[in-house]
Amino acid sequence: MIWLVLFGALFRSVSDIPGFTTGSYVEFLTPGLIMMLAISSAGWAGMAYIEDMNAGVMDRFLVSPIWRGALNAGSAAQNVIIIVLQSVIVAVLSLVVGGHFPNGVAGVAVMIAIAALLGASFASLSNALALVVRQRESLIGAVTSVTLPLTFLSTAFMQQSLVPSWIAWVARFNPVNWAVVAGRSAATGNTDWTLVLSRCGLLVGLLLVSAWLATRSFSAYQRSI
């Protein structure tokens, strides 16, 4: 919320730059902040796994007849609920400080669903990493070294046509940018549904790979005990 208020006020005049496609910077910024919030929140999902390992809870889970994928799905679902609630708060605050969503509630709902999809992917990756490293410090270092670079190497804060060409090139392969572009297109008018669906398809693929890695990582953990 602080990012929205401060950045929205500080860079208000950015929307006057030729080539900027939204009516206000707050309107442009909101989808980017929601996606940043999603990966920041989901990135810590693995901390719960580490706590369970230290307390011996994880070992009891692994000797029970529970599908390993269900453990990851439960963790990801918990994080998705949190992300949805946080995203709703940010969207409402955006309206309060002058933002506008031309596509209404439906567009905002699609944007939040995309954030949930991104968050579920990162929660699964966090769980996979936690099962491999099994240390808080290692997970904290990995999350903090990935979250902000992925955000700034996207179009979360600036129009793609206005960023350096190398950042625009990197953003093409950045899942955070996939979500930002799709969410912004869905919520802020002039929606390109082909673009939205294609980026959502990439995010679904990322989620499937992430969930598979998280499930397979239980084997690495079991071999270590």
Q: How should each PLM-predicted stretch be described?
A:
Residues 152-209:
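Membrane-interfacial helix-loop-helix junctions in multi-pass membrane proteins
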Residues 216-225:
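Short cytosolic juxtamembrane segments of multi-pass membrane proteins
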Residues 9-13, 130-173, 177:
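Transmembrane helix segments
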Residues 13-23, 99-103, 190-193:
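Short extramembrane helix-to-coil loop segments that connect adjacent transmembrane helices in Major
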Residues 2-9, 25-97, 117, 126, ...:
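Hydrophobic alpha-helical transmembrane segments of multi-pass membrane transport proteins
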Residues 9-16, 51, 60, 64, ...:
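Transmembrane helix-loop junction
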Residues 68-143, 193-215:
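Alpha-helical transmembrane segments and their short interhelical loops
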Residues 1-24, 224:
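Hydrophobic alpha-helical transmembrane segments
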